[in-house]
């Protein structure tokens, strides 16, 4: 069941927070494929897609945030690196809640990456870029 599909801005956090407790009560692992979101249930699984490249990753929501009200999601360091935004610090993204297969859930709970997702097609990226352009930043 997909009940959340939004566009906005992603940033990343946590390089210095290793071992701290997340809102889910788990120890934060900066290199894990995890993220913080304000409202999605803990845990939730989302595909995060960059709107400039189409690159898509699967992450597990296990924390609350981002602190910045203009951000939709805060990625762990590992997720930011996988999405290719660790250097720039921020990117326009689509965040879509998904229900992955059990093997992917197990991998993410263990701090490992799930198999790569296909890149988003250019036609869909154009539509989503128009949606995010209407957001006030």
Each model region followed by its residue ranges:
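Secreted/periplasmic proteins
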Residues: 1-137
């Amino acid at each position: 069941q997909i009940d959340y599909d939004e566009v906005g801005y992603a940033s990343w956090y946590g390089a210095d927070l290793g071992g701290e407790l997340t809102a889910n009560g788990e120890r934060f692992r900066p290199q894990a494929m995890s993220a913080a979101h304000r409202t999605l249930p803990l845990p939730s699984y989302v595909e995060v897609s960059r709107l400039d490249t189409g690159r898509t990753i699967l992450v597990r929501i296990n924390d609350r945030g981002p602190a910045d009200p203009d951000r939709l999601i805060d990625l762990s360091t590992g997720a930011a690196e996988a999405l290719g935004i660790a250097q720039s610090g921020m990117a326009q993204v689509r965040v879509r809640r998904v229900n992955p297969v059990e093997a992917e859930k197990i991998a993410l709970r263990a701090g490992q990456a799930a198999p790569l997702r296909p890149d988003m097609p250019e036609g869909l990226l154009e539509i989503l870029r128009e949606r995010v352009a209407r957001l006030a930043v």
